[in-house]
A protein has these predicted regions:
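Conserved alpha-helical substructure of the radical SAM core
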Residues: 1-108
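Residue-level marker of regulatory loop/turn positions in helix-turn-helix DNA-binding domains and
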Residues: 2-6, 240, 291
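Residue-level signal for mature regions of secreted extracellular proteins and peptides
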Residues: 10, 14-17, 230, 250, ...
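Residues that scaffold the ATP/ADP-binding catalytic core of kinase and kinase-like folds
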Residues: 20, 24, 67, 96, ...
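Radical SAM enzyme [4Fe-4S]-AdoMet core and its adjacent flexible, acidic
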Residues: 83, 99-104, 108, 112-274
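Membrane-interface junctions of multi-pass transporters
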Residues: 261-303
Length: 303
């Protein structure tokens, strides 16, 4: 049976990043600049994605602003008819560059938040002055009128500041904040011993989010991504493997999800060699866990 079309695509434009966040989920072996897809190759990827049925495009990294051709890439996404969201730390952006991205057709900005105070944010990000730069860029985002989402990655060291992070997002004029407890993949897994929150911290975070949702109803949408470590079952992910979204790595490798390479034995195809529609429909990695036919009994027949 032919799978339904994907709705969203994550385009990891680069693994380069000026920050050094210990919770980064990128792989330990990063793609070099010389192996990255060119702007022309990304434009072709966007055309193929739109033809496949993709509606939403998320430009990520690394730090996508590390690419000098980011404006050209955004223009290509607009030409393909994709709703385009930029996921960024803000470092590498400027008022002029944001204006150029606006003119190129960028629809939305998702700004990461390492902390609500300069000392903590700059220490976590490993970039002196990064918090001040982020505030400047946030003000410019608001001035231009981009819809804004704040992405707050929470861990042992900043979870006590969660109420301030939520109010900070509201003060910036954000429409949404994603409160995401660290997902331990890539570099985050290597640093898990330092980042893992306590059960008490996670329970308090749940109460904080519930209260904030009542307080900010109609002003600020609040998403909460808990860690799996204190749950009886892992949370469902993206409505099922190979069902609603796909990722393209900086070198053109096509993945069912960001963490798919951590699963041994999967074979991933590359956009430089195989059409995106063929990868989505018939690719071995996408077919491996799509649907329920791969499940053993009694799981497969369980209601």
């Amino acid at each position: 049976m032919t799978p339904a079309a994907p709705i969203a695509m994550l385009a990891e434009l680069t693994h380069r990043c000026p920050l050094s966040c210990p919770y980064c989920s990128n792989p330990l072996e990063l793609t070099s600049r010389h192996a990255e897809l060119t702007a022309a190759e990304w434009a072709e990827a966007f055309r193929q994605a739109a033809a496949l049925g993709v509606l939403q495009l998320h430009l990520s990294g690394g730090e996508p602003a590390s690419r000098p051709d980011l404006v050209e890439i955004v223009a290509a996404a607009r030409a393909a008819g994709l709703y385009t969201n930029l996921i960024t730390s803000g470092i590498g952006l400027s008022p002029r560059r944001l204006a150029d991205l606006d003119a190129a057709g960028l629809d939305h900005v998702q700004l990461s938040l390492q902390g609500v105070r300069a000392d903590i944010a700059d220490r976590i990000g490993g970039y002196r002055g990064g918090f001040a730069r982020k505030l400047q860029i946030a003000a410019e985002i608001a001035r231009i009128g981009f819809p804004l989402t704040i992405n707050a990655v929470m861990h042992r060291h900043n979870l006590p500041d969660l109420p301030e992070a939520i109010s900070f997002a509201a003060d910036l004029g954000a429409r949404r904040i994603e409160v995401a407890c660290v997902q331990f993949q890539g570099w985050a897994l290597r640093n898990r011993a330092s980042l893992q929150p306590t059960r008490a911290q996670v329970e308090e975070a749940k109460r904080t989010v519930a209260q904030a949702r009542r307080e900010y109803a109609g002003r600020l949408a609040i998403d909460f991504v808990p860690p799996d470590y204190f749950s009886d079952f892992p949370k469902a992910c993206m409505s099922g493997w190979g069902s609603t979204g796909l990722n393209i790595a900086p070198d053109g490798k096509v993945l069912p999800c960001h963490a798919a390479e951590t699963i041994p034995g999967l074979v991933f195809q590359n956009l430089r060699e195989t059409a995106l529609a063929d990868i989505w429909t018939h690719g071995p990695a996408f077919s491996a866990f799509r649907g329920t036919g791969w499940l053993p009994e009694p799981c497969q027949s369980c209601e």
